[in-house]
């Protein structure tokens, strides 16, 4: 941003940044008006700043002393020529000045006493002891064209001068910091220690230039260990390192050297950054120019350079009359009262410079209308100034967005800005309402415990009800009902519903409001109309079984389309668990047209009431056959409450051959079942097993006859034929010349099976023989055992029944012999083993009673007894 030399004092008009898009690093303020008596009526040639005062020296030899607030304390005319340099002590009580008239004058600001040192030669620089006011030595350094650095001090007999360095050419600049002094002369930079009273070292200029006295030396002490030097187009950083050895001099060294593209008119440190006042010109412009020719100057730039020598910013400063100024006419001085403040001073202007702080950052963001960032930055401030209160910034921010038509964005930021101020929050809602943009703020209304008044939410719901039924329904489900009056919104919704009952969205909204207003029956009928799963939940939660009794089919349809499997099972369970409200006859009648529902109902009913609803046996067969073949077969096997003909018809309909075989078997159509196994299932092994299970000789004959023209079947029969009789029958019927595959293997297996059977029978015979004898003996003993009687001890008694006396106390075991029909003693009974062995009836009967009555075991026992009798 370019400015004219006579522009106003405002920051914007005075400063031009090198990058307009970036936030400035420094802030500027022209304060020339505070010192009008000096800058308007005179031209400044020298200056100094203390914690309390500004000191200005003019080309007319006058010295001005101002307070920081711009009040002129004193004007002193002490010199007859231009004041070249000023230096003030730390207490701001004593001021040293030097002039081209060769005089150095020390002035006491409070007492107005002055001490004059006349060196008879033009002086260029002066430096007063920082602790001049507290030390009795009263030391001041000066130097100039005489080529000497002179230390003037107060001695026992008066003032005395001590030459610290002679024959050094012109002395351009002297700077005193605590116990260190640095001066710049034609020989370079010399560093002196007042503690040791010795020169620590000298740095020669990196290069020699013609007319090098044109370029002012800049000396700035950042600390006792660092000195920053500016000269020509170079910036040097010098390090002073104290020794750990006693009485050893500190060592100085050049730490860094930076060359810039302009002339250094001032340099100092702002924190860890270098602040330099750059005179925009090439060094060669001054070293090669004709002495009488004056170079027109450009606006100087104030540049901030970091520790890695990267330029952070560069701002051109539009000082008054800058085109007629030379590099030595500018001064860059730090403010002793603040490390972040400094001043740029020219003969006719003064600009206050400081680093931008957080408040400046916020103001910059506001100026760029970056309100969101500004508000975030304000929240981090330890103290918020009145002009930057969040409420004010928030108001500006929202009006800024509204002015740009960004209502949605404005509604989005309001919650974060007014979360703790619900009254202001609510006012913004009405602002949106006035501009017909309620929908842009509705999504951001608070819905928790800290919420707005019900009127706000009802107003927005009414707006949506009139313009957007879908969003109205969405808000009803999103917002807690505590935010608004449910009855009020329900009545408004019901009124519109009566006008348009075809709207599913409006129906859902009204059902929701009925439910929230504790009217579940009305809500149920509306949800049922919408085919919503919620109607099933309402039945279960509010016991609306009587209301649902006539709508079973519709409820089943709703549950079948539901996404949740729990809803489907819940519906079937409800119908079964509440049979008093849902009689099975009515349920079956309603859902009869949908076999899937019948299947689910029958399955659920069977779980709770096994072997029930037998009157619907044929209907169960229909649905089980369609949806669950395993359950269909289980039902065929485990129940009898169905028509066999109907079952056979279903099996044929669905081509359930295994089930059809079972049904044909139950119907007595064994031959048809056998043919089904052979012709349809093509399973000769199963056919053989089926014939064995039926134990029907005619079936064997049919199977053998059917297999005679099928060599593969013949071989399979030979391997699994079983009894000798069937095997003989099969072998005898095989047509001569029939070629049988792997016949040898089949015959070998047949013979091996026959041999195994013979061995089995023989083993069983041996086992049963011994067991038969043992059982026969035991049976004989049981049959011949008698009862114990008491008889009198009378020799005339015999063993007749009529002669027994039960009062006799002697116990004598008696056995009644069936053969002789008499009672005998046990010891007189002789068991003849051979007789027992020959008693076939007893052995056979007792063995039969001892064995398990399985069919196969009975057959084997018959075979065993047959073989036994033949032996």
From Swiss-Prot:
Organism phylogeny: Eukaryota, Fungi, Dikarya, Ascomycota, Taphrinomycotina
Start and stop residues of the CHCR repeats: 575-716
Keyword Transport: yes
UniProt gene name: vps41
Domain of life: Eukaryota
One cellular component (GO) term of this entry: late endosome
PROSITE patterns linked: CHCR
Gene3D superfamilies assigned: Tetratricopeptide repeat domain (1.25.40.10), YVTN repeat-like/Quinoprotein amine dehydrogenase (2.130.10.10)
Matching InterPro entries: Clathrin_H-chain/VPS_repeat (IPR000547), TPR-like_helical_dom_sf (IPR011990), VPS41 (IPR016902), Vps41/Vps8 (IPR045111), WD40/YVTN_repeat-like_dom_sf (IPR015943), WD40_repeat_dom_sf (IPR036322)
Keyword Protein transport included in the entry's annotation: yes
Keywords, alphabetical: Protein transport, Repeat, Transport, WD repeat
Family membership: Belongs to the VPS41 family.
SUPFAM superfamilies xref list: WD40 repeat-like (SSF50978)
Role played: Required for vacuolar assembly and vacuolar traffic.
Protein name from the UniProt record: Vacuolar protein sorting-associated protein 41
Region of interest: Disordered: 1-23
Placement of WD repeats on the sequence: 39-76, 78-117, 119-162, 166-204
GO BP, sorted A to Z: cellular response to starvation; endosomal vesicle fusion; Golgi to endosome transport; late endosome to vacuole transport; macroautophagy; protein targeting to vacuole; vacuole fusion, non-autophagic; vesicle docking
Gene source species: Schizosaccharomyces pombe (strain 972 / ATCC 24843)
